Amino acid sequence: MQFNIPTLLTLFRVILIPFFVVVFYLPFAWAPMVSALIFCIAAITDWFDGFLARRWNQSTRFGAFLDPVADKVLVAIAMVLVTEHYHSWWVTLPAATMIAREIIISALREWMAELGKRSSVAVSWIGKVKTTAQMVALAWLLWRPNIWVEYAGIALFFVAAVLTLWSMLQYLSAARGDLLDQ
């Protein structure tokens, strides 16, 4: 197994997750800001690892496996934390929608890979926009310095949920022929 800079960035993202969770629960006024900062650093590595792997031609099978896993674990844990913090349907509903979509699309990608058609459900531009909206919304909801940032975070969280459903429909449509094939 090769450890290059992109793969190390992905591993760093995974290592940041428990620190992000612990800081989230600390009983200090600075904890939300630092928790959001750790989350943002982890989120930025999600962009950099893929960019550097492509730019430096350092893509590896391990990195291709670990990157989406690290991304989904980071985002799912952040969604669980903000859902717990806010105790409200307007955070829980979009979070549940996005987590369910990730499970559905992960299963679809695995199944399409077994058919040798993984490229038909490759990441699309709408998926990238969705991920950006999720990350920004979650950072704002974790940070929560004032009510306006919280409202903006909740609004963007709903936008991310809509983009999530849109991208899921695109992926299901791309796989429709194989899904409905008898």
From Swiss-Prot:
This is CDP-diacylglycerol--glycerol-3-phosphate 3-phosphatidyltransferase. It is found in: Cell inner membrane. One of its GO terms (cellular component) is plasma membrane. Pathway: Phospholipid metabolism; phosphatidylglycerol biosynthesis; phosphatidylglycerol from CDP-diacylglycerol: step 1/2. Belongs to the CDP-alcohol phosphatidyltransferase class-I family. It comes from Salmonella typhimurium (strain LT2 / SGSC1412 / ATCC 700720). Its main location: membrane. The chain crosses the membrane at residues 13-37, 61-81, 87-107, 146-168. Residues 38-60, 108-145 are periplasmic. GO terms for biological process: glycerophospholipid biosynthetic process; phosphatidylglycerol biosynthetic process. Catalyzes the conversion of cytidine diphosphate diacylglycerol (CDP-DG) and glycerol 3-phosphate into phosphatidylglycerol. Essential for the synthesis of anionic phospholipids, thereby playing a role in balancing the ratio of zwitterionic and anionic phospholipids, which is thought to be important for normal membrane function. Keywords: Cell inner membrane, Cell membrane, Lipid biosynthesis, Lipid metabolism, Membrane, Phospholipid biosynthesis, Phospholipid metabolism, Transferase, Transmembrane, Transmembrane helix.
